[in-house]
Amino acid sequence: MRESFLDTIQHHFGHDPVWILVVGDLMLDRYLFGDVQRISPEAPVPVVLLKSQDERAGGAANVAANLAGLGIKTRIAGVIGQDAEAETLLGLMHDIGADTQHIHCSACRPTITKTRILGGHQQMMRLDQEDAAALSAEEQLALQTAIAAALTDRPAAIILSDYAKGVLSETLCQSIIAQATASGIPVLVDPKGRDYSKYHGATGLTPNKRETAEACHVAPHDDQALLAAAEQLRHTLKLDFLAVTRGEEGITVLDRQGSAHLAATARQVYDVSGAGDTVIATLTAGLAHGLPLHDAIELANIAAGIVVGKVGTVPINKAELEQELQSQQSAAQADKVCNLDSLLARVQNWRHQGERIVFTNGCFDLLHAGHVTYLEAARNTGDRLVLGLNTDRSVSALKGPSRPVIHEQDRARVLAALESVDAVILFDEDTPIDLINAIRPDVIAKGSDYTEDQVVGGAEVKSWGGKVALIDVVPGRSTSNIIRKLAS
């Protein structure tokens, strides 16, 4: 299962000519970060000393950001104001490569902006700037015209991201669903409100547990009644599926074959903001690239488990999803054997934790005690050891046609089992200089049979403040000696 997910992400996300249209309530999320050390003398409220601020895509714009993070071409349709916040939001969308030509800029309403004030990681207050009234006839016509133009280019799928802020009226939803159905384009909806009739005929809905309970008029804690009512809702709305997101409990999917539940990946939850956006974006991306429904939902479940471990509205990205899938694929090997994107995501995470990155490289054919001792010593020069491993082709080029004895995947698997090794990446080039420049390690480790000026990447690592560490080799221990002994 994980292999098919990885294949889809690595070879299709961002490579296939697939694009997805997102329609809905576009928002700007603004975060003001500070520290709280005292209470105001003017009123019994905390004083937040502002340290930094950040602006991120929110609402339907965050759905687009998640798609872009997965490498999916994205177009956005919605309504924003003609204000500074609109310029900021458009800039964020342009930065991620999203197509904004179908966004209508209205002089009659502000850009929806949610400003959150945080002391440490604790949200103290949220300030909302919005006009949630229904669109005017002029705004509605402008948006419908823009969406019709987008549909002529046949998106692989359409996402309706409804935050009940006036954009997705029943008229607009039914118009989009009818046009999409006639063209064989799936429509997935992240719904809002108590009346889901405006989504009638959509492909699928992804409400959370509370939203499902409200729409079905049942108690959220009564699972049996909730699922029965949800299935009736699916049937009434003529949906292919209804996927109920349940936070730390995972996702329950109801379709024509019945119901199934996917448990969430256990992890610490910091912030659920935007998790629903990640679910519908990843689910739609998976379906658009040919994954079966339950596989696409499982992939979305994994992606949501990643983003809830972050503070604020932060979209998923392809590299960290690949890393998580590799981690789940095998506790021993795939957790450590990386491609470059996954490795860079992991290195970035280590750096954020203040850890020093050590890099070493070699063939490591017929692993022996000398190798193990060397790798332990290399790891001790920093906090994390990344091992660049020569592919079979490059080993043959260096050592001759009779080498390597052990296949590259087997060598990687054995090295990944060592506690001293934190990541293994194969490289096919004559030297690892491109890999070194990408990783930018703090330390390059090499055997003491080299001099510093002979170490590939030594000058580069010194140029960014790192160092070269020469590790004593164990006398008499080498793969060549082992091969000669076996031959005799």
Swiss-Prot record:
ATP binds at N208, K209, R210, E211. The active site is at D277. Keywords: ATP-binding, Carbohydrate metabolism, Kinase, Multifunctional enzyme, Nucleotide-binding, Nucleotidyltransferase, Transferase. GO terms for molecular function: ATP binding; heptose 7-phosphate kinase activity; heptose-1-phosphate adenylyltransferase activity; phosphotransferase activity, alcohol group as acceptor. GO terms for biological process: ADP-L-glycero-beta-D-manno-heptose biosynthetic process. Its EC number is 2.7.1.167, 2.7.7.70. Pathway: Nucleotide-sugar biosynthesis; ADP-L-glycero-beta-D-manno-heptose biosynthesis; ADP-L-glycero-beta-D-manno-heptose from D-glycero-beta-D-manno-heptose 7-phosphate: step 1/4; Nucleotide-sugar biosynthesis; ADP-L-glycero-beta-D-manno-heptose biosynthesis; ADP-L-glycero-beta-D-manno-heptose from D-glycero-beta-D-manno-heptose 7-phosphate: step 3/4. It catalyses: D-glycero-beta-D-manno-heptose 7-phosphate + ATP = D-glycero-beta-D-manno-heptose 1,7-bisphosphate + ADP + H(+); D-glycero-beta-D-manno-heptose 1-phosphate + ATP + H(+) = ADP-D-glycero-beta-D-manno-heptose + diphosphate. InterPro entries: Bifunc_HldE, Cyt_trans-like, PfkB_dom, RfaE_dom_I, RfaE_dom_II, Ribokinase-like, Rossmann-like_a/b/a_fold. Gene3D superfamilies: 3.40.1190.20, HUPs (3.40.50.620). Residues 359-488 are annotated as: Cytidylyltransferase. One of its GO terms (cellular component) is cytosol. The keyword Nucleotide-binding applies. Residues 1-332 are annotated as: Ribokinase. It is an enzyme of class 2 (transferase). In the N-terminal section; belongs to the carbohydrate kinase PfkB family. In the C-terminal section; belongs to the cytidylyltransferase family. PANTHER family: BIFUNCTIONAL PROTEIN HLDE (PTHR46969:SF1). NCBIfam families: cyt_tran_rel, PRK11316.1, rfaE_dom_I, rfaE_dom_II. Catalyzes the ADP transfer from ATP to D-glycero-beta-D-manno-heptose 1-phosphate, yielding ADP-D-glycero-beta-D-manno-heptose. Homodimer. HAMAP family: HldE. This is Bifunctional protein HldE. The gene is hldE.
